[in-house]
Regions:
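A generic structural signal for short hydrophobic patches within well-formed alpha-helices
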Residues: 2-3, 133
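Short glycine-rich, flexible loops that bind phosphorylated cofactors or substrates
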Residues: 3-4, 53
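Conserved phosphate-binding/catalytic region of the ribokinase-like
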Residues: 10-147
């Protein structure tokens, strides 16, 4: 959506498994350009998805704020049940995290992990608990999702 709003082309996200890296520098430059066009925007969150098949996606998130970039590891979701509502889950978790956590890295980690879990739930509504999101962050350093 940022690319549509600003006319600035977004970098591609091509990670195919957990443990892969993605071009953080390109996303940082993208976010800097957005912040120049929209100077009153304090936080730029971006959810990143690559779809290998209907059941296999990778997912990550970035947050640009006050000239600094925070980013998550790549999550490998090989048991996607329903990807409808994943963006809504990301936004809802972002709003929750903005108020629940001081640390910006924790905010983007939480928002991303919440969205990752939503991929494993049928329907448009995300019904995961905060404890499930925090559990995914604590237990799955590899980025692979098992639910």
């Amino acid at each position: 959506e940022y690319a549509l709003l600003t006319g600035i082309p977004a970098p591609g996200f091509k990670a195919t498994k957990s443990g892969e890296t993605y071009d953080i520098k390109a996303y940082e430059e993208f976010c800097k350009a957005i912040s120049q066009q929209i100077p009153n925007c304090k936080y730029i969150y971006i959810a990143l998805r690559n779809v290998m098949s209907s059941e296999h996606h990778t997912f990550a998130g970035v947050l640009y704020s006050h000239g600094t970039m925070k980013y998550t590891r790549v999550f490998d979701i090989d048991n996607v049940i329903d990807c409808v509502g994943v963006g809504d889950a990301f936004c809802g978790a972002m709003l929750y995290a903005q108020h629940a956590y001081e640390d910006e890295q924790k905010r983007v980690d939480f928002s991303t992990a919440d969205s990752v879990l939503k991929n494993t739930i049928a329907g448009d509504y995300n019904i995961v608990k905060v404890s499930e999101v925090e559990g995914l962050l604590a237990k799955h350093e590899s980025g692979e999702v098992a639910r």
